[in-house]
Amino acid sequence: KVKQSSYHLAWLVELFVHSTDINDEVPIHRWKIFVDAHNGDILDKFDQVRTATVSGQVTGSVKDEPYGLAQTRPMPHVKIDVSGVGSTYTDEEGFYSIDIGNQSRNVTVKLEGAYLNTNNANGSDASITRSVDPGTTEDFSFGSLNSTSGERDTYYHANIIHDHAKSIHSGLTGADYVMPARVNIGSEDSYWPCNAYWDYTGINMFSEGGGCAGTDEM
């Protein structure tokens, strides 16, 4: 049976709502409400805000010197990989946002980004993988449980140097590529310890030894 259409004289009311409830996963709403012009009944309503994105910040525990105090700092230009969707990058303050559709996805974050890819020469590379839902905030933090201090320090400071150089002259493009950064290199390398070098492609940083602090933490 075909349902017959009916018409109502109605008011269209638009409401922009910003919730102050810290537990509200979607704090912003933009409602369209159709109100019967004769009796005030609500005929229909819908929220124009769509919760198809996931956003958050990537941070890491970083030092300014080998024996200094570590602080939580934003990780810039980190690549955010989303299964079945693609990738995006954090900004200079470590924030990201990406549309993931209407289903849960696996997100993988490494200390790899637009300008640097850190590789642990004597262990597993820093990596975090987590299932995320649309419309949620997902922060990722690199610390001692998922990375080495050399990976974190090298990634952070190399990116800071890159961005500082670009701020002086935007035409400096020689480092605008994903530079390999080998860290935690040990005695398997004949140049170890107390050393670091550039091999015309990437940087190589050594672990602690021989009375020297790790150059990947300097």
Which ranges hold each PLM region?
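Surface-exposed loop/turn motifs at beta-strand-loop junctions within extracellular Ig-like
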Residues: 17, 111-115
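Structured interaction patches on ligand/partner-binding surfaces of diverse proteins
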Residues: 116-139
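Glycine-centered loop-to-beta-strand initiation motif
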Residues: 56, 84-111, 122-126, 140
